[in-house]
Amino acid sequence: MRLDKFLVACAVGSRTEVKNLLKAGRVTVNGKKEKSAKLQIDEKIDEIRFDGQVLEYEEFVYYMMNKPQGVISATEDPKHRTVLDLLDDIARSKEVFPVGRLDIDTHGLLLLTNDGQLAHALLSPKRHVDKTYLAEVKGIMTQEDVEIFAKGIPLKDFTCQPAKLDIVSVDSEKNQSKIRVTIAEGKFHQVKRMVGYCGKEVVDLQRLTMGTLILDENLERGEWRRLTKEELENLLVSIA
């Protein structure tokens, strides 16, 4: 790998900035100052330092985000803020993208990565990766609805796979319910449409899980962090 490409991948700066940093003598390779951007290095063997700090190359990165409402699950959008706008410059420089989509008014767990193979595996219909949502509903969900979800709901354009519906709480006075829904698909507005089929309306929707990943309760809306080693290992094992 070229030295300048390595430095860009380590988020030291853009390619132009990296060339200037090399000229300034701020980069060393195996203890010697190096000014050539074209130098071929072995990222697994050579020790590269920037301002004395050892740099470690990461091919892939994995971030958990608590996506807020009002933000688009995309890398760019002409009208709305995207989830990438919530990242810092270093995280954005890794060229990550959201794995799947959450509607603009849905909040909760979102995985961002630059690992296309993992993203493809998690989104593949063949994998049946479960996703769990917590929904606040206008209307009273019933045991009959639980059975309807379990059979597979026939919508206009497709029939849903059997889904698990748990009724968390019911408030008869306010005509509200709180439910937990687990689905293996992720079609457009699916949970909202499934609830709508039962004659009720989702007024708030939060994703809690995706496969083995569970939303960190300590993450405020709009916050993100790297996956822990254990979280990543469990995720990789689950799609192996």
Positions of predicted regions on the chain:
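Basic, flexible Lys/Arg- and Gly-enriched helix-loop patches that mediate nucleic-acid binding at interfaces
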Residues: 1-240
